[in-house]
Amino acid sequence: GEIVDVALLGDIPLHDAEGVAREVLALVPFRQVVERGFACHDDAAPLRCLVVGERHSLSLADALAQLPTDRIPLEDAGFDIDDEAYADIVRRVIADEIGRGEGANFVIRRDYVAQVGSDPLTAGFTWFRALLEHERGAYWTFLVSTPDHLAVGASPEAHVSAQGGVVTMNPISGTFRHPAGGATAETLTEFLSSTKETEELFMVVDEELKMMSAVCSDGGRITGPHLKEMSRLTHTEYMLRGTSTMDPRDILRETMFAPTVTGSPMQNACTVIARHEQSPRGYYSGVAALFTPRAGGGHDLDAPILIRTAYVVDGRLRVPVGATLVRHSDPYGEGGET
């Protein structure tokens, strides 16, 4: 398809010059949050649109048969912020932001970085294969390659979707890392009894209900909580659903971005992120938004959050990872979560 960079969500080209509806995949960077008047480190990451020209389908078996299994060497690998420095940031956020009433929870990231010692596209397809084979419970497993930029990941979380007028949000929070022998009833019960994990989930659900009320005429309905099991982690989640007649681009704008990867309240969270994170987020915590034409007119929207995603630019690998900080957070424990 054709690659088009646009300035605003409303500029995403859902129709051609003759008004014919088109399918578009948009990579929405975190910096688009300025459309809501919120703060951010502006890194000029483009709102990049792939206007779909052709679509092909493969079975998983056929895809795996064609994807490479190369060993991808990484050099100078490690976190850009070490454990002690990250723990210091956590302490400051708890004391200076949460302790002074700026909000109840904030997500602060650091980046795992390395130099990729092979062709970036080969590396991306190799990692994509590994995710297809070994990760489970992902909402989207994807690779997006555009000029000078590659993204590959397995996002567990749908931020927002709009299918036939039904809007769905899926807040996921709380993270249980499976022990070496696997999860047991006892370890899961301990996780579910954690005050910190419970606070995280309730706070993000409350914030997303506010978003639903802004885009849905009926305000939305809530179901859950549920457990979401992945290959090495288990999360807690809720499902929120409501109805809306809004343009899907407007739905996306009014729900930027998920409190599960920013914090709450949303505006304060963006200010705290700008104050305490040392570099721009790029696409981390943004979305990959797929707009698909409906037979009766309009477009459906499917927008997973861009987390659990690796980016390669100019041969440099970056994997942004964050932890949700609440008043009960342990600074070193949050570093371990990343």
Ranges and model annotations:
Residues G1, V28-V33, V144-D148, L290:
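Short, flexible beta-strand-to-coil junctions
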